[in-house]
């Protein structure tokens, strides 16, 4: 019995450790760094990042996140890292670098990858960035050089009714954008970073 209880305790502790962010630090006014696991040696910030201009940033008006930074979850598995960021119903998402086919990214799947001849709206572009901004006044930067996929609120809420799903499926997709767009409002952005043993996420607030 004692062995069983010990086993259950270890399993539970392991599951919790895959979700909780191991480090949270404000590295500049309005910039919070979330970190978990073993960070890659080469990342955009480690290679090109300069020092924040602290005094100039202090002069900017303070902004409040629409969620607690602790609500951002980072899970590390054998496959890589999965990041979950809360998303409100009336929130729109923009970014991921120079995008040709789409502007508002809510409800879409984006994979920012360098491509000199992008033929679709999935994220391939001349100047991709693992960064997006929200109409709620904040930005999310995933500090990684790995191929990263963003599911921008395309998940189904658990309370989403069966009838609503049936109605939405009546719409026939005729473009790539429509194919990956979800008519319902998901409540999270899922960020998938395969192969990563750890990750840094910068949460940036602004006026």
Go through the PLM ranges and name each one:
Residues 24-207:
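Catalytic and substrate-binding clefts that recognize carbohydrates or anionic sugar/phosphate headgroups
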Residues 1-26:
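Bacterial Sec-dependent N-terminal signal peptides
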């Amino acid at each position: 019995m004692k062995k069983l209880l010990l086993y259950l305790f270890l399993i539970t502790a392991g599951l919790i450790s895959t979700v909780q962010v191991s480090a949270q630090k404000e590295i500049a006014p309005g910039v919070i760094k979330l970190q978990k696991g073993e960070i890659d040696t080469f990342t955009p910030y480690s290679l090109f990042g300069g020092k924040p201009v602290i005094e100039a940033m202090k002069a900017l008006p303070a902004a409040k996140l629409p969620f607690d930074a602790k609500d951002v979850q980072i899970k590390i598995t054998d496959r890589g890292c999965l990041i979950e960021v809360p998303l409100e119903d009336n929130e729109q998402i923009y970014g991921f670098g120079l995008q040709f086919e789409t502007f508002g990214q809510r409800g879409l799947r984006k994979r920012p990858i360098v491509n000199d001849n992008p033929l679709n709206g999935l994220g391939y572009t001349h100047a991709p960035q693992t960064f997006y901004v929200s109409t709620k006044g904040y930005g999310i930067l995933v500090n990684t050089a790995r191929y990263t996929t963003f599911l921008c609120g395309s998940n189904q809420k658990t309370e989403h009714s069966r009838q609503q799903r049936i109605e939405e499926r009546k719409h026939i997709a005729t473009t790539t954008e429509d194919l990956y767009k979800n008519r319902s409002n998901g409540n999270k952005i899922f960020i998938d970073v395969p192969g990563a043993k750890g990750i840094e996420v910068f949460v940036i607030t602004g006026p």
